[in-house]
Amino acid sequence: MVLIGEMRDLETIEAALRIAETGHLTFGTLHTNSASSTINRIIDVFPSHQQSQIRAQLSLVLEGVLCQSLLPKADGRGRAMAMEILVPNPAIRNLIREDKIHQIYSAMQAGQEKFGMQTFNQSLFALYQKKLITLEVALARSSNQDELQDMINRLGAPGGAAPRPPAPYAQAKK
């Protein structure tokens, strides 16, 4: 197992990919705010003539992307962690390879139940639903406030069933 701190430059990212290709479980950190932006950051650090090759390479070695954000709790004591989870299933790997990173968010939404993926909005919604964070905090952190507001509105819809929390939260509750 190899842990690479901040992957900021081409040389470091190139080394991480090379190490992962040799079969070593490789962890790296980047300061990004979504799974898609993480993948774009890795690819974009390379010159344009190499990016197709890097997309193919990354699609083969990527094992997961976890983005996290610590948010102030509603009760004012401590922080709650919102997280985005990307699990590279065959569809995700294909989107990376075909340079369709912009479609990953939709694939993550669809892969919540089956693959354990989760968008930040799904995580924010679960934290808000459990009253761990305020609506203001949830909306401030959301990159798609309309989507999050729709999720929240469905929760309060008369006669409507409350949506189930994202898979990681549902499992932790058991």
Predicted regions and their residues:
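Short, flexible helix-loop junctions that flank or precede catalytic/ligand sites
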Residues: M1-K174
